[in-house]
């Protein structure tokens, strides 16, 4: 039964009863124990502070609908611009989000131009790649299973000439990765539809075309690729992240393992006929993301985001990895490129027990020298290094783990008003929401806090793509229905005055005398407190304002609900009648409200009811109600009328009396 709002009595209804499942259905003891364990685990997870503190809906005008449902989208945005390009089915959408104005959209049609297909679902032209090339936009799509590319210049579409194999897959459902670096192009897309079933990482444009050996990866799912410019140009590396089938077939071993692979960008292939067209510097290492304290392992890599060091030190680039386990719980582990590089440079090879050849496998050679055949043969037969890549920090554990299933991540490095640096993670969930998580401190003593859950769309849907514009401090997200621009600050969602603003621990926001504002929009210094356990104590007023008193008159023996909005999921909510606790709602409660149900109102249940929110040492009164008997309420109403009549009488008589006194 849906609770009526406060102020309305509930209609009569039978008392709810809870049946004991084991007793009712005679479940076996082992299953009963499993049920008890599952309920206890679910309850424990509900108390985790890794969940978002509040939930917020982005109500801005920066939403634009597609002209049709788009089951597959690709997003392209250039930092600092107001434009977003989105590739859909036979269309490229150009969205414009000017500051302070409504968003607009233009559409360019790019239909199928050739090819024949048997499955009608694959007969469209699904755009899978958008990339700036010269003064135009390179657009590549499936083109009815005959992948092709076009150049888009000023809304004019021209088909690209020349060999374009490897730029787009044959189906939008295929796992694919394309990396551009200057005139070089790297791809994991097969060139032919009906051969080359084994996935490879290729250089498809550059000095010489190369591909990985067919034995070095087992059914890989590619996640991210990047090029890292190191101290010497010949030492520049290509790193790509993927997961693959676990070669360990032990029934207790995980099905998948997560990897990072390295290649030398200057790799020219080998000397022999077997190695001349292959990458000769391929090595791979396992990415570890596990928590020994809870015995939880997260072995399925979902996404990777690289955050460069602000001083330009490539070794200090932070690699944020989102992992999941078979139960769809998630963890975020952070690695450094320096640690990854060290593992590849110093580790022995797994399963190889002889002396390593010189140059050692994976080593980049100057002056474009070819890799000796012996070095290639050792690396090709033993491509995995023995040492594993572990997270940063002394404990080598995840930054945090959560019961939520995270799928994508972007990270913004920002400075608060006092100059302190924070890393703010934006993680997409399988529920179509975004979690905003702040990380501060050094790798030895990090502070992590889940600020909020953002609902970015007008129409709830899965998030297909996300892009961060650090310059304009915006997120761009797409679903099958719409594209949305979301600001990184959103300070207006925090209620509760100064205390509520500071309790958010949002580094983008601060208290400016009378409201919670973005530090980027305020013209003067604002009050902020991010790390402390008691940020509310920084406010000038020691206590938050009390809730306004609300009164309602009720007849005896009636039913009634009192509702208290649960703004913070980290707080415990208590309904008190006078001094007695009548109802408690614990942290992590998924209900939007803490409800006190009065089934049969008696004389002693009239009086004052207060809903208190307790969050650490922060205590505030969220609701204050007084339940009055109907006869008393009527008496108070009559007394109020009498006072009003008396006041009006004296207001009419006093001028006459005063005038009389003045005359005499």
UniProtKB/Swiss-Prot annotation:
Which stretch carries the motif Cell attachment site?
265-267
Give any Gene Ontology cellular component.
GABA-ergic synapse
Q: Tell me the CDD domains matching this sequence.
A: Sema_7A
Q: Which Pfam family, just one, is annotated for this protein?
A: Sema
Q: Which UniProt keywords apply?
A: Cell membrane, Developmental protein, Differentiation, Disulfide bond, Glycoprotein, GPI-anchor, Immunoglobulin domain, Inflammatory response, Lipoprotein, Membrane, Methylation, Neurogenesis, Signal
Indicate the segments forming the Sema domain, all copies. Answer: 53-488
* Residue ranges of the propeptide: 647-664
Give me any GO biological process, just one. Answer: regulation of synapse maturation
Question: In which tissues is this gene expressed?
Answer: Highly expressed in activated T-cells (at protein level). Highest expression in brain. Lower in heart, thymus, spleen, testis and ovary. The expression increases in late embryonic and postnatal stages. Detected in T-cells.
Q: Which residues carry this modification: Asymmetric dimethylarginine?
A: 132
Can you name one GO molecular function term for this protein? semaphorin receptor binding
**What happens when the protein's gene is inactivated?**
No visible phenotype. Mice display normal levels of lymphocytes in spleen, and normal activation of T-cells by antigenic stimuli. In contrast, production of pro-inflammatory cytokines by macrophages is much reduced. The effect on contact hypersensitivity and experimental autoimmune encephalomyelitis is controversial. Reduced size of the lateral olfactory tract.
Q: Does the keyword Disulfide bond apply?
A: yes
Q: State the disulfide connectivity.
A: 117-123, 140-149, 264-364, 289-333, 491-509, 498-539, 501-516, 564-611, 585-594
Residue ranges of every copy of the Ig-like C2-type domain listed in the record: 542-627
PROSITE patterns assigned to the protein according to its UniProt record, in alphabetical order: IG_LIKE, SEMA
Q: Which residues are glycosylated?
A: 102, 154, 256, 328, 600
As for what it does, the entry says: Plays an important role in integrin-mediated signaling and functions both in regulating cell migration and immune responses. Promotes formation of focal adhesion complexes, activation of the protein kinase PTK2/FAK1 and subsequent phosphorylation of MAPK1 and MAPK3. Promotes production of pro-inflammatory cytokines by monocytes and macrophages. Plays an important role in modulating inflammation and T-cell-mediated immune responses. Promotes axon growth in the embryonic olfactory bulb. Promotes attachment, spreading and dendrite outgrowth in melanocytes.
Would you identify the family this protein belongs to, as annotated?
Belongs to the semaphorin family.
What is the name attached to this protein's record? Semaphorin-7A
UniProt source species: Mus musculus (Mouse)
| Gene transcribed to yield this protein | Sema7a
């Amino acid at each position: 039964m849906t609770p009526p709002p406060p102020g309305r009595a509930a209609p009569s209804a039978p008392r709810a009863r809870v049946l004991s499942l084991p007793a009712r259905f005679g479940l076996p003891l082992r299953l009963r124990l499993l049920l008890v364990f599952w309920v206890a685990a679910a309850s424990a997870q509900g108390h985790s502070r890794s969940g978002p503190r509040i939930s917020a809906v982005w109500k801005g005008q920066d939403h634009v609908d597609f002209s049709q449902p788009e089951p597959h989208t690709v997003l392209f945005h250039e930092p600092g611009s107001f434009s977003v390009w989105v590739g859909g089915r036979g269309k490229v959408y150009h969205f414009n989000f000017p500051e302070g104005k409504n968003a607009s959209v233009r559409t360019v049609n790019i239909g199928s131009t050739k090819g024949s297909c048997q499955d009608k679902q694959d007969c469209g032209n699904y755009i899978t790649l958008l990339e700036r090339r010269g003064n135009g936009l390179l657009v590549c799509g499936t083109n009815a299973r005959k992948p092709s590319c076009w150049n888009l210049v000023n809304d004019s579409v021209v088909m690209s000439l020349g060999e374009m194999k490897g730029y787009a897959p044959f189906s939008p459902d295929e796992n694919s990765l394309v990396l551009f670096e200057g005139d070089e192009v790297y791809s994991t897309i097969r060139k032919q539809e009906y051969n080359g079933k084994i996935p490879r990482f290729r250089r498809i444009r550059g000095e010489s075309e190369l591909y990985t050996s067919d034995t070095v990866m087992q059914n890989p799912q590619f996640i991210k690729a990047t090029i890292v410019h190191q101290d010497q140009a010949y030492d520049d590396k290509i790193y790509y992240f993927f997961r693959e089938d676990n070669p360990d077939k032990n029934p207790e071993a995980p099905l998948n393992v997560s990897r990072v692979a390295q290649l030398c960008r200057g790799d020219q292939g080998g000397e022999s006929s077997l190695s001349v067209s292959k990458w000769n510097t391929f090595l791979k290492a396992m990415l570890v993301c596990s928590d020994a304290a809870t015995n939880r392992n997260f072995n399925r890599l979902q996404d990777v985001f690289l955050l460069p060091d602000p001083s330009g030190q490539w070794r200090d680039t932070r690699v944020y990895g989102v992992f999941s386990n078979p139960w769809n719980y998630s963890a975020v582990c952070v690695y450094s490129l320096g640690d990854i590089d060290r593992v590849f440079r110093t580790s022995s090879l797994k399963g190889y027990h002889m002396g390593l050849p010189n140059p050692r496998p994976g080593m980049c050679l100057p002056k474009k020298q070819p890799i000796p055949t012996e070095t290639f043969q050792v690396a090709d037969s033993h491509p995995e290094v023995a040492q594993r890549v572990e997270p940063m920090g002394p404990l080598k554990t995840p930054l945090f783990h959560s019961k939520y299933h995270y799928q994508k991540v972007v990270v913004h490095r920002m400075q608060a008003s006092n100059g302190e640096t924070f890393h703010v993670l934006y993680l997409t969930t399988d529920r179509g929401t975004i979690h905003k998580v702040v990380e501060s401190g050094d790798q030895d003593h990090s502070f992590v806090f889940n600020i909020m859950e953002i609902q970015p769309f007008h129409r709830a849907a899965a998030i297909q793509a996300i892009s961060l514009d650090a310059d304009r401090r915006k997120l761009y997200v797409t679903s099958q229905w719409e594209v949305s621009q979301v600001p990184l600050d959103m300070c207006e969602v925090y209620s509760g005055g100064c205390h509520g603003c500071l309790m958010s621990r949002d580094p983008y926001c601060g208290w400016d005398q009378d409201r919670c504002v973005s530090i980027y929009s305020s013209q003067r210094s604002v009050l902020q407190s991010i790390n402390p356990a008691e940020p509310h104590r920084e406010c000038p007023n020691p206590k938050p304002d009390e809730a306004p008193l609300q009164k309602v008159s009720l007849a005896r023996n009636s039913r009634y609900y009192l509702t208290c909005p649960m703004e913070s999921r980290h707080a415990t909510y208590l309904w008190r009648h006078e001094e007695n606790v009548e109802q408690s709602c614990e942290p992590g409660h998924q209900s939007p409200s803490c409800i006190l149900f009065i089934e049969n109102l008696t004389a002693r249940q009239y009086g004052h009811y207060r809903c208190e929110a307790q969050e650490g040492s922060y205590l505030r009164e969220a609701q204050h109600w007084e339940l009055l008997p109907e006869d008393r309420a009527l008496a108070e109403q009559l007394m109020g009328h009498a006072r009003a009549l008396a006041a009006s009488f004296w207001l009419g008589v006093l001028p006459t009396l005063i005038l009389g006194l003045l005359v005499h």
